[in-house]
């Protein structure tokens, strides 16, 4: 938790001309691309982002648990550019680095493109060092649902392994609540793959 707070403080010294946003969160299970990154346990998370005329840079961090004495913290650095393709389609392109507080775990770098409409999000990420780690994700948003946000997620890897999930979300002024029900990419089971996340916007 102290490492997460340190990252937030580092980003607090930033140019005044950029818009800064951030959040802190707790999740009952840190799930990423169809697999738990915390062995089914809880994790504190935090993120901060700077935006200026479409350009963005940010950092995000989470506690992790891989079942050994290796990494206890993941921290991701990213940057890119958002723009409107048309009235109904927006796009962002950028680069993201995944890092861990263990020198034995190699940094992973991805280039990504993200397309978004009112009802559909599509993302493709390319691992700059290993194409076996490329990733595609499709998110379908349920229309005409005002009480909660409903989103169906489908992810696919180059080896044809896939995962599916259902996201339910509710937002208030500074609080976001999310529930994910996920099919594990390894065993294809939905059982026990449920994560509840509470986030507070800074």
Where are these regions (language model features)?
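Sec-dependent signal peptide recognition
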Residues: 1-7
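Outer-membrane beta-barrel proteins
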Residues: 4, 16-202
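Hydrophobic core
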Residues: 9-17
